[in-house]
Amino acid sequence: GYSYIILFDDYNKIDLTLLPLEELGNYLNDDKLIKIILDKDGRIQQAVVPTDMDYHIRKPSAREYDDCCNEFWNTTTYVVKGLCRKEILFAIDHFNQIVRHELLRMISWKVGIETGFKLSVGKNYKFIERYISEDLWEKLLSTYRMDSYENIWEALFLCHQLFRAVSGEVAERLHYAYPE
C-alpha cells in the first residue's frame, strides 16, 4: 500500500493509506488505532473501533527487566568514555538513544504496576507525566540539559539515581531480583 500525510490549509492532518483489497484484512488486524472514514463499497464487515490496547504498557518478564538494567548500566560506561575523551556528541548519542530509553522504559513499568498495565503512555512516552509524581517528572526533565560536559555529567548522575530508585521499586513490586 501507499501512505500519504495530507495537511490542509486549516492545519488538520490526515494519514491516508491506500492499499490493494487483498491486504485489507491484514491491515485491519495490524493496527488497532485506525479509523475508517469511508468504505463506499461496504467491504468491511465488522465495525472498526479504534483502541490503544496494543500499545498498553506490558508487564516485563524477569529477563526483560534484567536486560533493561544491564543495557542501562553497561551503556553508561560509553557515555562516561565519551565525556572523558571530550567526544560530546558520542556521549550525547549514547545517553539519549540508549540510557534515556532504558530509564523511560523502567519508569513506564512503574506506571504499569501502579495502573494494572491497563494504559498506554503514548509514543515516545509523551503522556508519562500524567502518571508519575511531580518530583520524578522534574528530575526526569533535569536530565535533558546536554549543552555542556558539566551538564551531561550532572544529568548522567541524576539518571543513575532515578534508575536505581525506580528499578529497585519495580523489582520489589514484581518480585524480581535486582542486579547488584
What name fits each language-model region?
Residues 1-90, 94-96:
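Conserved NTP/Mg2+-binding pocket subregion across the NTase superfamily
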